From Swiss-Prot:
It comes from the Eukaryota. It is found in: Secreted. Residues 22-48 form a propeptide. GO terms for molecular function: acetylcholine receptor inhibitor activity; toxin activity. Expressed by the venom duct. Residues 52-54 are annotated as: Ser-Xaa-Pro motif, crucial for potent interaction with nAChR. Belongs to the conotoxin A superfamily. It comes from Conus lividus. The lineage of its organism: Eukaryota, Metazoa, Spiralia, Lophotrochozoa, Mollusca. Alpha-conotoxins act on postsynaptic membranes, they bind to the nicotinic acetylcholine receptors (nAChR) and thus inhibit them. At high doses (10 uM), the synthetic non-amidated toxin (residues 49-65) completely inhibits frog sciatic nerve-gastrocnemius muscle contractility. It also inhibit the cholinergic miniature excitatory postsynaptic currents (mEPSCs) frequency and amplitude of projection neurons in insects (D.melanogaster). In vivo, the toxin (100 ug/kg) shows good analgesic effects in mouse hot plate model and formalin test. This is Alpha-conotoxin-like Lv1.4. The cysteine framework is I (CC-C-C). Alpha4/7 pattern. Possibly amidated at Cys-64. One of its GO terms (cellular component) is extracellular region. InterPro entries: Conotoxin_a-typ (IPR009958), Conotoxin_a-typ_CS (IPR018072).
């Protein structure tokens, strides 16, 4: 192979690596968002139970409003 062909191959490898890395990064962001939403929902369940209990609601007025 000539130098020009080897340089072209190097550029193609770098471009392909960048595209794959960029795509995977966005996929992980989506998974993290879904996991964070699920965790938030799970944490909200005990708070809702607390807000329906008058002594607990009084103790945690900042959470129950």
């Amino acid at each position: 192979m000539g130098m020009r062909m080897m340089f072209t191959m190097l550029l193609l490898v770098v471009l392909a690596t960048t595209v794959v890395s960029f795509t995977l990064d966005h996929a992980f962001d989506g998974r993290n968002t879904a996991a964070n939403n699920k965790a938030t929902d799970l944490m909200a369940l005990p708070v809702r139970g607390c807000c329906s209990d008058p002594p607990c609601r009084h103790k945690h007025q900042d959470l129950c409003g």
